[in-house]
Design a protein with these regions (language model features):
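PP2C/PPM-type serine/threonine phosphatase catalytic domain
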Residues: 1-200
Length: 200
């Protein structure tokens, strides 16, 4: 429902209109769609989700997100997390009470502090990031990052240096296998995008 609602809005836009503000609007529309469904049918009262949306305009990556789904960029063998999780354990990290490495093992690791479809008033984080040539963009759910840490993600990407479409499919498969081998029970969702500048 969330993806359908956001997608219907974004599909009506021209590529150049996929700005931070419109990505944010798509998530707000998804939020309202879930709230409306809950009002119509009690069986959906517990419905809620995390959400991340991204677009590339020129060499700029625009993004909007709520929850603990993540956006990463890989370039020059460096993996950078662009988004900040809206979660209880991330708040503990920010307060210096636990390390990032401890997040996956904390008993309250699955508690998110912000979600789509819970309250009418929703704060959506947005931002943009300049992509370098040959950057790799990874969007993923906590089904991936809750099971394997950034070092494993970094290692898997480094072991798949080529970036053809078939290579990206293999990288997708390898990352999913790592998560399921680590015991993933949740859905593991991820999207990989290779950015290559078009030279005039």
């Amino acid at each position: 429902l969330a993806v359908e609602s956001a997608g219907n809005f974004l599909e009506r836009l021209e590529p150049a209109e996929l700005s931070e503000s419109n990505l944010k609007e798509s998530i707000l529309l998804a939020n309202q769609a879930i709230l409306d469904r809950k009002q119509d049918d009690d069986q959906f009262l517990s419905m809620g989700t995390t959400m991340i949306a991204a677009s590339v305009i020129g060499d700029t990556l625009n993004w909007a997100h709520v929850g603990d789904s993540r956006l990463y960029v890989w370039h020059d063998n460096i993996l950078k997390q662009i988004t900040t999780d809206h979660s209880f354990v991330m708040e503990l990290v920010n307060e210096g009470k636990i390390s990032r490495e401890d997040m996956r093992f904390h008993p309250r690791k699955n508690e998110i502090t912000r979600a789509v479809g819970i309250e009418k008033s929703l704060t959506v984080d947005t931002g943009h990031f300049k992509l370098d040539n040959d950057s790799l963009v990874l969007l993923c759910s906590d089904g991936l990052t809750g099971m394997i840490d950034d070092n494993v993600i970094r290692s898997v990407i480094a072991d798949n240096p080529r970036r053809t479409q078939d290579d990206l499919k293999k990288l997708d498969k390898d990352l999913m296998e790592k998560a399921y081998d680590a015991g993933a029970k949740d859905n593991v969702s991820l999207i990989l995008v290779q950015f290559t500048e078009t030279l005039e």
